[in-house]
């Protein structure tokens, strides 16, 4: 499996929370030759089952992405936006986007230039209220091709960086779905001492709804959730993020301590470098929802 090509392929697909049909169909086909059974549920989560002898283990990563949605078409043809998931408006000015209307339309996100702002305005951050998408057409034409509720996704093509680094949109959390695919490939010809369920969950970015329903359907004995975290950069406050040279194990009330220790011991045995992260309340990931399924599921993140 060419991991770099896989990352480029899986991050290019649109799969906004609540609109994952296309990307879930893609992942279902990728898993099909690697496992015994693949299903896509009503929430568009993909459940790939490798049958084995032992407890049911749920390995979960989410396939949905944050994005934007058209809320209004202005008289000049520009589009107003709402968010789907946790979009930070500060990064949006001058961003390139795709509007998924009756046709797929390219656009750029515009904002009032700082030269025309008052001092008070310049002191405030951008919000969705003062941003718009310019698709370069009249209001009449825009209304023929775009409807309220159409999705707007980011144009962030995959780029390979130096030192085996990689840049793309949707690495949260398609990079972890790629890990699930690679794991399924590695286990393909082995007889496992566990019943393994690879779950590509939907709607994580809007509350973990796909993981919740998948965990209810599977009723796993334990779960391992894969997600991304904050990477250390020059502007990060001390101790607020971690370097990207190791995997991160989360500690906190939403993860099961004994299972966490088994994960850490296994990593040490195989010389896998780990960093530690603390989530003192909820984790903000699918682990929160899976852990509360049915009578409870021991989970690690």
Task: Kindly give the residue locations of the regions a language model identified.
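N-terminal hydrophobic/helix-forming segments and targeting peptides
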Residues: 1-301
């Amino acid at each position: 499996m060419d991991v770099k090509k896989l990352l480029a392929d899986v991050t290019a697909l649109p799969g906004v929370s609540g609109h994952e049909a296309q990307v879930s169909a893609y992942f279902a086909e990728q898993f099909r030759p690697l496992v015994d059974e693949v299903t896509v549920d009503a929430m568009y989560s993909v459940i790939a089952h490798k049958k084995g002898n032992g407890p049911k283990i749920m390995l979960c990563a989410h396939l949905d992405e944050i994005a934007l949605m058209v809320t209004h078409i202005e008289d000049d043809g520009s589009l107003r936006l709402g968010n789907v998931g946790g979009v930070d408006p500060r990064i949006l000015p001058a961003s390139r986007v795709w509007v998924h209307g009756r046709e797929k339309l390219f656009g750029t996100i515009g904002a009032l230039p700082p030269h025309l702002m008052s001092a008070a305005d310049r002191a405030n951050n951008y919000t969705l209220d003062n941003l718009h998408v310019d698709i370069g057409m009249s209001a009449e034409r825009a209304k023929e091709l775009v409807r309220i509720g159409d999705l707007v996704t980011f144009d962030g093509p995959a780029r390979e960086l130096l030192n085996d680094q990689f840049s793309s949109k949707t690495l949260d959390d398609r990079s972890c779905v790629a890990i699930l695919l690679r794991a399924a490939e590695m286990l393909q010809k082995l007889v496992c001492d566990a019943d393994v369920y690879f779950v590509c969950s939907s709607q994580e970015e809007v509350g973990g709804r796909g993981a919740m329903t998948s965990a209810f359907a599977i009723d796993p004995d334990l779960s391992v959730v894969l997600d991304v975290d904050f990477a250390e950069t020059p502007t990060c406050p001390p101790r607020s993020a971690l370097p990207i040279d190791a995997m991160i194990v989360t500690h906190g009330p939403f993860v099961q301590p004994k299972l966490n220790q088994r994960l850490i011991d296994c990593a040490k045995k195989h010389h896998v470098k780990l960093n530690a992260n603390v989530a003192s309340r909820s984790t903000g990931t699918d682990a929160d929802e899976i852990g509360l399924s049915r009578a409870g599921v021991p989970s690690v993140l």
